[in-house]
Amino acid sequence: MQKRWDRYGEVSWFSMAGRRWVAALGPDACQEVLQNKDRAFVNSDGWSVLIGPFFHGGLMLLDSEEHLRQRRIMQQAFTRSRLEKTVDVLNPAIASALDAWTPSDGFRAYTALKALTLNLATDIFMGGAEGTTESEIDSVKKAFVDCVQAATSVIRYRVPGTRWKRGLDGRRTLENFFRRYLPARRSRETDDLFSVLCHIESDTGQRFSDGEVIDHMIFLLMAAHDTSTITISTMMQYLGQNPQWQNRCRAESLALSTSTPSYAELDQLAGLDLVMKECLRLVAPVPVMARRAVCDTQIQDHFVPAGTYVSVVPHFTHHMPQYWPDPEHFDPERFADHRR
C-alpha cells in the first residue's frame, strides 16, 4: 500500500474479485467515504461481493432506514446490564478452557485461541444446544470457519472442492441449525444472545423476524470469534516480545485479587487497555472496509463513477508516519492521556 500511496496518492484504481475498485488511502479519503455526506456509498453492495453469500443480513451489510431500524433493535442486546451478565458467564468458561491448555515449544496460540473463542461463541451465545450430538456441534463450528474462509476464495463459483462451495454449504448448515432451535428460544426468554435476539424490541416496539434473528446470529457469532482471535493473538505476540509491558499488565491483573474480574473491574486494567489499542493499530482485525458508489461522486476531488467498488483502508492510516511516530514500533503509551 505504501508503494501505491507513493505512486498514485489517496485515490487509485485496481482490480479484485473480477471487478474494478478504487482504493481510498489516508485519513481524509477514508473519512470522506465513511461519513458519506451525500449518501453516494452503500455498505451492502460493497460487502456483498466479498462476503454477502455467507453473511447477508448482518448489520454491516445493511443500509439507510433498514440499517437504522435493525440497529435500534440490536442495541438493546448490548446494554451494560446484559454485558455484565455475559462477563460473569464467560469468566468460568474461559478459566476452564485455559486450564486445559498445555503450552510447549510447538504450541500454536492462534489455533488454540480460535478454538477457544469459537467454543465460547457456540456454547454461551447460543445458550447450549439441547438435544444435539457432539458431531452436530462440530459441524456447526466447521460451518462458521468455512464461511469465514470462503471470503478469500479465488474461485468464486459453486465449484466442488473450493472454499466458495464450502462456504455456501456452511451457510446452509448454520441456517438450518438456528431455524431448528429458534422456536424454543421464542417460547422462553433466557440470557443467551440467541434468546435475547428473539425477544428484544426497539423503543417503538419493533422486533426481529425469524429470518433476521438467524441472519444476525450467523454474523455476530462470526464476528465474535474471528476478530477476537486476531486481537488476542496479536496481544500475546507483542506482550511476549515486550516483557516490560507483560510484567506491567500482569501486575495490574494480580492487583485485582481475582481470577474472575467483573465488568467494572476490567476497566481498571489501564495497561492492558493501552496494549489492546496499540495492537488494534498494528494489526487491524478488519484492515479494509468495502463500499460501492450508487451515483457519480468524488473522493478527494477524484471522480468516481456510479457502480464503482471502493476499498477503504484504515490499516494503511494506522501505519502512516505523519500521524504515528515510528509506526512499526510497539508503543502502547502513544494512547496514554499524556501523549494525546
Model-derived features: where do they sit?
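N-terminal membrane-proximal hinge/A-helix region immediately C-terminal to the signal-anchor transmembrane segment
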Residues: M1-R69, D88-S96, G170, C295, ...
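Cytochrome P450 heme-thiolate monooxygenase catalytic core
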Residues: V42-S48, E66, R82-T231
